[in-house]
Amino acid sequence: MDEANIQDKERFASRENHCEIERRRRNKMTAYITELSDMVPTCSALARKPDKLTILRMAVAHMKALRGTGNTSSDGTYKPSFLTDQELKHLILEAADGFLFVVSCDSGRVIYVSDSVTPVLNYTQSDWYGTSLYEHIHPDDREKIREQLSTQESQNAGRILDLKSGTVKKEGHQSSMRLSMGARRGFICRMRVGNVNPESMVSGHLNRLKQRNSLGPSRDGTNYAVVHCTGYIKNWPPTDMFPNMHMERDVDDMSSHCCLVAIGRLQVTSTAANDMSGSNNQSEFITRHAMDGKFTFVDQRVLNILGYTPTELLGKICYDFFHPEDQSHMKESFDQVLKQKGQMFSLLYRARAKNSEYVWLRTQAYAFLNPYTDEVEYIVCTNSSGKTMHGAPLDAAAAHTPEQVQQQQQQEQHVYVQAAPGVDYARRELTPVGSATNDGMYQTHMLAMQAPTPQQQQQQQQRPGSAQTTPVGYTYDTTHSPYSAGGPSPLAKIPKSGTSPTPVAPNSWAALRPQQQQQQQQPVTEGYQYQQTSPARSPSGPTYTQLSAGNGNRQQAQPGAYQAGPPPPPNAPGMWDWQQAGGHPHPPHPTAHPHHPHAHPGGPAGAGQPQGQEFSDMLQMLDHTPTTFEDLNINMFSTPFE
């Protein structure tokens, strides 16, 4: 019995010894893995303590990264053999559009900076070397940079809280240093931009990139640029790492011997470029609206147009700022923007400015869609000043009512309605037969269907037929012309003829211009008159030659009148009967001719020189060989008739 008890005790003791040995072995393994976890930066960066397998896997990956496995050649070199260290460094910095700098972690003193800082920040290499990095950082970013350079705990140095067990563990200074050594650092900060002459810079790409990410002058007048810095916390670099730059260590820096080796690159921000078209346009602003019309974003340029600040509009309904007469159709337009997803709409309306006046705005609106859900997130509106509408200025203070707007639009539209049926040669070009040129002298107006009034028909019956007075080279219908401005052109009815019209001598216009301004005008005999609404077009006056049959077969054009062809045949005894002195009907409105001081018979000026003698003086000008209109360079419609 006693022997059995003794054997049981020995067996139990040996079992306890084995368990103790296993427990000590497991504790040692855990300690080594924990120490390995402290040495691997990726493990220490995790929020929770990883398991042993994760620690071992991250440790292997970190060792491969340190050895450069897979990134080196067979001889272990990190660069091509034909490149020196300096050439490789310049190539890397040029490709990265950045600069290399080394900063002491404790003091923040710049112990090295590459010469590529000049095209990036407009500072020379000597401007940065030996200075504090915090002097080149925006004041609001200095605390963040100080945290990035710190390698020790600020208050609880050497004391680490284990979140899993809830206990506080004491760690030595070496453990904290091991935690920081090799740690990657990456941050974005605002760095000061210097005043180096840009003409000395070689890279134009960096200048454009600097304009893209420049934040502009701050309150103190200093320009800042957004710089993205990436690097590692390292021990003090050996003296041969930067052979061209001498680096001295302060006495205070001997305690930590760590520094930040980083590359600074310009960070492209969402700030609009200065050279981009429309980005600095002060006559437009951008707004963003919710689906109910509330302002969720307002560009600060709204102050220049409406007088509001963005904070005065945020959260308010946009319909409250529209003109009461525009609110209904603006709501319908916004509904269409929401229904037609992504389609651009152009709107014109009146918005109330801060001074209670209504300003015309032209808005291009579209709905922004969520790319994942394909649902409308918000409405984006680009609002521009609507001071120009149909090419004419709009006065916001004068055009408040729809009646005024409609009247103003009608004035802007080119609508020309003739008082009598006829053709107005003022808009469309008509090239005479045989003419090689097509200038502004021969223009015809756009025609529109319009029935003649009874008074106009009576006047037309008193006038000679168009078939008798049409010059050679043109053929018109003998019926009354039912056309006026605004309708289709009758050019299809004009057949070509082989006879070239004969122009009037150009000197006759300039010589008789003073007489044109003093005398009254005669009415048009063929029912073709000019439009009087536009000063650029010819006013009413003699369009065709008003002739008189004097001495039987002799016919002449009055000076200053335009005749497009030779005179009509002599066998037309009745075409000038109304101009004869005795016993014949007079024209409907007998007035003095604008080019002659002699009035027609029956006119207010009385009888003058016989018509045959007047026209015989001009016959010699019409007997020459017919020529084209290329020699006639006088614009007959440019003379201002009174």
Curated annotation (Swiss-Prot):
Its main location: nucleus. Residues 346-389 form the PAC domain. One of its GO terms (cellular component) is protein-containing complex. Residues 13-66 form the bHLH domain. PROSITE patterns: BHLH, PAS. Efficient DNA binding requires dimerization with another bHLH protein. Heterodimer with ahr, trh or sim. PANTHER family: CIRCADIAN PROTEIN CLOCK/ARNT/BMAL/PAS (PTHR23042). It is found in: Nucleus. Residues 450-612 are annotated as: Disordered. The lineage of its organism: Eukaryota, Metazoa, Ecdysozoa, Arthropoda, Hexapoda. Residues 463-482, 528-554 have a biased composition (Polar residues). The gene is tgo. This is Aryl hydrocarbon receptor nuclear translocator homolog. It comes from the Eukaryota. GO terms for molecular function: DNA-binding transcription activator activity, RNA polymerase II-specific; DNA-binding transcription factor activity; DNA-binding transcription factor activity, RNA polymerase II-specific; myosin binding; protein heterodimerization activity; RNA polymerase II cis-regulatory region sequence-specific DNA binding; sequence-specific DNA binding. At stage 11, expression is detected in tracheal pits. At later stages, strong expression is also detected in the CNS. InterPro entries: bHLH_dom, Circadian_TF, HLH_DNA-bd_sf, Nuc_translocat, PAS, PAS-like_dom_sf, PAS_fold. Residues 555-564 have a biased composition (Low complexity).
